[in-house]
């Protein structure tokens, strides 16, 4: 088994899927023969009708589930061959925003956003100002010491996005990241994603928001009937 590539190692493809099929239980396949490659530093939208498999595809890329068939490489690693401990290391290089947000209720909003930095071993004095500044930028300056349970859906979404980007991940995966915010905040969050991409993060955003997609010239991965094509 090849060792895990070190953080920062150059790879020719940040994401590589070959002939991916996915089914849940004995049902029909959700994804069929999905094949595509994305280069490091790329920015793509993932679009398609509800139920087309966008969330399932992001879960595959974050290694939350395994494909029924086919191969997946993320950040240069064959995810079928990495050990559980190395899978955890690989996930720390990925920022993820799911639709259910997954904020930890026993932590404040500030602590939730700071968690990736704390887990990576950084000292609080090195990131305290960065976390505070980011929370203010996404409009949560007055909520940073609040528990997630009292946040609105849009506020939880912004906190989850801040947590996903605070550590400047190599890859950002976001599932409908602007679904609970107003158009003005959606544009602000898009600027955040674009700036993160400019600094080197590869970005893949699943969205139905055509107005949001029209604001950039980023290519789209379109899912339809379990198949994907780049448009």
Task: Locate the predicted segments by residue.
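ABC ATPase NBD coupling module
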Residues: 79-95, 196-198
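Catalytic Walker B motif of ABC-type/P-loop ATPase nucleotide-binding domains
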Residues: 172-175
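Short coil-to-helix segment of the ABC ATPase nucleotide-binding domain corresponding to the Q-loop/switch region
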Residues: 107-115
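Conserved ABC transporter NBD signature motif
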Residues: 70-78
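Conserved ABC ATPase signature
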Residues: 147-151, 155
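Helix-to-loop junction immediately C-terminal to a conserved catalytic motif
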Residues: 62
């Amino acid at each position: 088994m090849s060792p895990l590539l070190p953080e920062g190692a150059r790879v020719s493809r940040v994401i590589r899927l070959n002939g991916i099929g996915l089914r849940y239980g004995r049902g029909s396949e959700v994804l069929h023969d999905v094949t595509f490659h994305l280069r490091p530093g790329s920015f793509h939208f993932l679009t398609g009708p509800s139920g087309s498999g966008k969330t399932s595809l992001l879960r595959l890329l974050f290694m939350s589930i395994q494909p029924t068939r086919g191969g997946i490489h993320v950040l240069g690693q064959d995810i079928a061959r990495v050990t559980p401990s190395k899978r955890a290391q690989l996930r720390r290089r990925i920022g993820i925003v799911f639709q259910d947000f997954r904020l930890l209720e026993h932590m404040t909003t500030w602590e939730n956003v700071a968690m990736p930095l704390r887990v990576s071993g950084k000292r609080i004095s090195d990131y305290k100002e960065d976390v505070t500044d980011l929370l203010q930028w996404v409009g949560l300056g007055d909520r940073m010491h609040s528990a997630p349970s009292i946040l609105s859906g849009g506020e939880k979404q912004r906190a989850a996005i801040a947590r996903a980007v605070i550590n400047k991940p190599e890859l950002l995966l976001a599932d409908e990241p602007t679904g609970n915010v107003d158009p003005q905040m959606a544009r602000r969050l898009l600027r955040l994603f674009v700036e993160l991409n400019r600094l080197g993060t590869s970005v893949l955003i699943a969205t139905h928001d055509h107005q949001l997609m029209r604001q950039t010239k980023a290519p789209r991965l379109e899912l339809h009937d379990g198949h994907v094509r780049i448009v």
